[in-house]
């Protein structure tokens, strides 16, 4: 600052000096100016007074300088203050910048830490992804190697065959030109052979170089997997957190109805067995009895199309659940149990087919070769030594299986010696057969559900379950029912069906639950294992109606499978809403409002088609609740797994087991309950063990896939939100669904059916599906005609009130239904009893050929179609004119009524869905109608013996049809393709040689396997094999004119026709073809290939359905 002041002072001094100098100059200038211009007198005066003027001027100038200096000083002071203020602002800005710098530094540190964590997670994810990709690459290389070896061998064999053909031609006397062509062809084929070998060598080199790397990576993968498994056993993994979350939401939820969706959870699907047995049976609350409803959806499509009915699903609404619970309660009531003991129901929704299982799905086991020998016909004599041999074999088999179990090392070493001793005491039965059994074998049986990756459960079901079956059937003694093993062998040579149904299931579940409780205690370190009698009694109390399956098996033969919503109270709601029960069977209503389920009054009138007699005595004799005499006679056979099984065996050994054939027939021939809506009726239901069908009902809702879970949740949430008061029993929803009242229901969506839950399709299964499909088709001929024409009108529901539908209903009551009832009374049960002894499939085929199908076809030919024609000639046009006259007047009113129609649903959204449900259902009915017409067409041809060959045995029915002029459209709906396979073969007649060219046997085999792969993936399809001409350029280039005369050059194509369109799967050359001179030879070759070579030699019985249709036609002539 001092320097600034000094500089300013110097500046001012210099300025003053300069000012003085300028002032002097001005003065002198003035002086000169005066001397020139003013007068002499004045000049004298001024000269005299020069000094005073000069002083005044100096004073004036000094004053001005002083004032200027004061101003400058003030300016400097102000300038100083301004500079100081600016300096303060600069300091404040510096402090703020420093604080922002610190804040940004902290923020950058946090971002760095977060990024570091993300990088760690990404690195872990990339490592896992690398492992999976390596595994996929390894599998791809292996599959590629197998396929290439197969095709190389195949092409090599065909090349050898062609070379042999050329050598044979060389032996003949040929022209020089022909010999030259043959030599050139031979050289070409040899060159091709060398190229193929070079390709094989290169492929082998690639595989060898990559195999070491893949082997090391797979070993590393296995080590990581084993460490994760050991971590899980030691409670060191995240799996426990995941399972805990599921249990908290799955079991401990306080809501009465809980809707969950596990559709996208692959881990849950893969570990289905583990979750099903361990979580749901071990960790549910002991003081609550939750009704677990497991729902499996079958999705037939991978890609969706908007105008396809496959997009839509039946919603599991309150009606379906109420029907299921009602049937389960009745089963429990018959067994004498309480409803709270039932807590497991499996529901499968297969698009529009709704079926459910009590407890769990059916158990079907493939017999392995080493086990099959025990059930061979030559070894039917069952004695104590054979039982011991079987059990010893099973134990040895289990030991070999568990040696590869990943849990057997560290986990089993945690067993305490006291536990092992206690297990030995509790399991003396194991020591009876082999004293050298590993004591840890008993514990190993529980870990079979952990290893879904290695699929140990398949071996487990084929060996361990047999051991349990033999222990149960033989009561752990040397005495065993000989008839049981005969039944096992008679059912099927390749499939072992558990005949004991729920009884065996309950025994297995009891074993699983008791022993897995022990596993859980050992894992959590609770202490010693104590299988007390309380545990056994608690499990025993959870047994269901263990032996009602066979009695429930053949309930009815009704073509309209309807389970009406029956109410036990007076003022039955069914009489108020008969149109809402079912349009297909308006007679299926209990007209007695005061009926109780357990009341056997003679006034219990039921118009169901299953009721063959309204007499109360016959009702009591046919009712499974009251038919105790016949059951008591077979008590030892019917209840071989109860606590008194040994006593029953001693008392009834001569009476029961010697008459086991009669008892088995009796249990399969007991009529269903004659009370209204006691059970869901289905023809030949015993093939499903405990499976029941719910046919089409008006209360069913149809929704799109993306809305399925939200609609389900909305339905049940609305039911939960109903205000419960003291008079909640009077609520209309509770009246409509009385069986849901007070139930703890947990609904769990498990996605698609797991691999373990497969159904073995029999003829009865196919017939049941056929009858179920017919229940969806309207009975009104006008409705059927509108479906044929594809009309989408909603007038069919209004026609139900007119005389037209009334006539059809009267016809059904007097004609069709009466015939079916007479058939049920006179022939069905008798045929079933004879069928069990001698010829199951044979008599059933005769029945199909002569009985049911014949009546249906005659009805279609003489009855229904005739009435439709008469109606077209006489009255339909007139009725249509009258309806057209009134349609314009009522059109707006009908449209408003459909939107604003009153409904009895719990929400407006579901009512809207119900009112607009017809268009989707009509599209589905149209598909089913095409399917039924296709089936009836072939049955009609078989009866009339017109242009079709029928081959039938115990496994399948093969229809071979030549020509396609009158063939109906070939459907590919899921319901149809669960039982039937369609193969269309288009053969070609060569113009030059007049030979008929068709596919070779190897191509036929490959095509059939490909078709089955599509069907296994739930892609409904049928296959077309066609022979096409090939352009002549290839023939000229290869100079094969001579060979063309012997074997024409053509291509064989195979197309899969499905709901996704037409997709080519094979395109082969002439090495895959053969020729014949007559179409009869073609048909004979294809029949021989399919029946005598492909099926028996390649063991493909399980690959194909029971009904196979092979349609043969000549291309460009009758295709």
UniProtKB/Swiss-Prot annotation:
The annotated regions of Basic and acidic residues compositional bias extend over 788-891
The lineage's top-level taxon is Eukaryota
User: Positions of the region Disordered?
Assistant: 606-627, 782-905
Task: Extract the signal peptide range.
Answer: 1-21
Q: Which UniProt keywords apply?
A: Coiled coil, Merozoite, Signal
Looking at the keywords, is Signal present?
yes
Coiled coil start-end: 170-206, 890-920
Q: How is it used?
A: Possible candidate for an effective malaria vaccine as determined by epitope response in sera.
PANTHER family reported for this sequence: THISBE
Question: What's the name of the protein?
Answer: Uncharacterized protein PFC0810c
UniProt source species: Plasmodium falciparum (isolate 3D7)
């Amino acid at each position: 600052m001092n320097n600034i002041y000094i500089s300013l002072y110097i500046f001012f001094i210099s300025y003053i000096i300069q000012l003085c100098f300028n002032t002097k100059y001005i003065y002198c200038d003035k002086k000169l100016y005066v001397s020139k211009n003013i007068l002499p007198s004045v000049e004298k005066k001024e000269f005299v007074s020069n000094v005073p003027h000069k002083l005044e001027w100096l004073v004036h100038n000094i004053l001005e300088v002083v004032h200027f200096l004061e101003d400058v000083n003030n300016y400097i002071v102000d300038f100083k203050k301004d500079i100081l203020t600016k300096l303060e602002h600069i300091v404040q800005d510096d402090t703020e910048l420093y604080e922002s710098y610190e804040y940004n530094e902290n923020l950058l540190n946090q971002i760095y830490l977060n990024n570091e964590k993300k990088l760690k997670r990404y690195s872990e994810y990339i490592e896992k992804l690398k492992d999976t990709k390596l595994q996929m690459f390894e599998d791809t290389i292996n599959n590629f190697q197998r396929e290439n070896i197969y095709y190389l061998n195949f092409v090599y064999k065909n090349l050898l065959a062609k070379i042999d053909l050329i050598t044979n031609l060389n032996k003949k006397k040929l022209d020089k030109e022909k010999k030259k062509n043959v030599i050139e062809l031979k050289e070409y084929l040899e060159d091709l052979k060398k190229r193929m070998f070079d390709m094989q060598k290169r492929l082998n080199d690639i595989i060898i170089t990559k195999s070491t790397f893949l082997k090391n990576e797979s070993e590393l993968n296995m080590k990581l997997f084993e460490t994760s498994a050991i971590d899980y056993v030691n409670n060191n993994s995240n799996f426990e957190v995941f399972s805990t979350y599921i249990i908290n939401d799955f079991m401990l939820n306080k809501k009465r109805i809980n809707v969950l969706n596990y559709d996208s959870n692959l881990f849950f699907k893969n570990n289905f067995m583990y979750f099903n047995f361990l979580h749901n049976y071990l960790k549910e609350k002991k003081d609550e009895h939750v009704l677990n409803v497991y729902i499996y959806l079958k999705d037939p499509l991978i890609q969706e199309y908007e105008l396809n009915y496959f997009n839509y699903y039946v919603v599991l609404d309150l009606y379906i659940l109420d029907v299921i619970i009602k049937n389960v309660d009745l089963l429990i009531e018959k067994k004498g149990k309480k409803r709270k003991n039932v807590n497991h129901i499996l529901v499968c929704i297969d698009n529009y087919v709704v079926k459910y299982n009590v407890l769990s799905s059916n158990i079907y086991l493939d017999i392995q070769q080493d086990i099959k020998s025990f059930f061979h016909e030559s070894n039917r004599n069952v004695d104590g030594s054979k039982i011991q041999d079987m059990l010893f074999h099973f134990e040895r088999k289990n030991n070999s299986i568990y040696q590869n179990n990943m849990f057997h090392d560290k986990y089993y070493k945690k067993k305490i010696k006291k536990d092992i001793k206690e297990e030995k005491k509790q399991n003396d039965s194991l020591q009876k057969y082999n004293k050298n059994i590993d004591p840890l074998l008993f514990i190993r049986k529980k870990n079979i559900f952990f290893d879904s990756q290695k699929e140990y459960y398949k071996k487990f079901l084929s060996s361990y379950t047999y051991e349990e079956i033999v222990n149960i059937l033989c009561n752990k003694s040397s005495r065993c029912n000989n008839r049981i093993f005969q039944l096992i062998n008679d059912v099927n040579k390749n499939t072992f069906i558990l005949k004991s149904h729920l009884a065996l299931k309950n025994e297995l579940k009891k074993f699983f639950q008791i022993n897995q409780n022990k596993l859980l205690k050992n894992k959590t370190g609770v202490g010693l294992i104590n299988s007390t009698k309380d545990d056994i009694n608690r499990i025993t109390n959870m047994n269901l109606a263990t032996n009602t399956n066979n009695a429930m098996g053949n309930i009815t033969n009704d073509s309209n499978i309807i389970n009406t919503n029956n109410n036990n109270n007076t003022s039955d709601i069914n009489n108020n809403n008969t149109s809402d029960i079912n349009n297909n069977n308006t007679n299926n209503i209990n007209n007695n409002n005061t009926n109780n389920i357990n009341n056997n009054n003679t006034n219990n009138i039921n118009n169901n088609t299953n009721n063959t007699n309204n007499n109360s005595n016959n009702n009591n004799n046919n009712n499974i609740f009251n038919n105790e005499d016949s059951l008591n006679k077979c008590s030892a056979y019917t209840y071989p797994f109860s606590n008194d099984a040994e006593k029953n065996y001693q008392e009834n050994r001569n009476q029961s087991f010697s008459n086991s054939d009669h008892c088995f027939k009796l249990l399969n021939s007991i009529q269903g309950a004659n009370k209204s809506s006691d059970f869901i009726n289905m023809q030949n239901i015993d093939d499903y063990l405990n499976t029941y069908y719910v046919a089409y009902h008006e209360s069913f809702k149809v929704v799109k896939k993306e809305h399925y879970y939200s609609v389900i949740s909305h339905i049940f949430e609305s039911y939960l939100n109903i205000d419960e008061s003291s008079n909640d029993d009077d609520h209309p929803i509770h009246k409509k669904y009385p069986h849901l009242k007070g139930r703890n229901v947990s609904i769990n969506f498990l996605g698609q059916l797991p691999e373990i839950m497969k159904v073995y399709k029999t003829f009865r299964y196919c017939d049941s599906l056929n009858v179920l499909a017919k229940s969806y088709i309207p009975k009104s001929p006008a409705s059927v005609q509108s479906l044929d024409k594809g009309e989408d009108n909603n007038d069919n529901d209004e026609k139900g009130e007119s005389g037209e539908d009334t006539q059809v209903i009267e016809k059904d009551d007097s004609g069709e239904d009466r015939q079916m009832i007479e058939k049920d009374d006179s022939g069905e049960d008798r045929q079933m009893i004879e069928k069990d002894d001698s010829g199951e499939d044979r008599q059933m085929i005769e029945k199909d050929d002569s009985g049911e199908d014949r009546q249906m076809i005659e009805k279609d030919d003489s009855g229904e179609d005739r009435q439709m024609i008469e109606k077209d000639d006489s009255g339909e046009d007139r009725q249509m004119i009258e309806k057209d006259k009134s349609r314009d007047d009522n059109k707006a009113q009908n449209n408003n009524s459909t939107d604003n129609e009153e409904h009895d649903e719990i929400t407006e959204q579901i009512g809207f869905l119900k009112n607009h449900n017809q268009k989707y259902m009509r599209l589905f009915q149209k598909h089913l109608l095409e399917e039924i017409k296709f089936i009836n067409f072939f049955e009609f041809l078989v009866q009339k013996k017109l242009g079709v060959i029928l081959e039938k045995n115990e496994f399948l029915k093969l229809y071979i049809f030549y020509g396609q002029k009158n063939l109906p459209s070939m459907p590919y709906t899921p319901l149809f393709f669960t039982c039937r396979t369609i193969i269309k073969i288009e053969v070609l007649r060569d113009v030059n040689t007049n030979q008929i060219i068709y596919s070779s046997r190897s191509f036929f085999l490959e095509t059939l396997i490909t078709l089955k792969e599509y069907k296994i993936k739930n892609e409904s399809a049928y296959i077309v094999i066609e022979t096409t001409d090939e352009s002549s350029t290839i023939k000229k280039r290869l100079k094969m004119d001579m060979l063309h005369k012997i074997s024409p050059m053509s291509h064989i194509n195979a197309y899969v026709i499905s709901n996704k369109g037409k997709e080519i799967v094979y395109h082969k050359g002439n090495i895959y073809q053969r020729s014949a001179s007559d179409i009869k030879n073609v048909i004979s070759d294809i029949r021989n290939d399919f029946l005598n070579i492909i099926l028996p030699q390649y063991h493909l019985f399980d690959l194909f359905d029971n009904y196979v249709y092979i349609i043969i036609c000549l291309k460009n002539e009758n295709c």
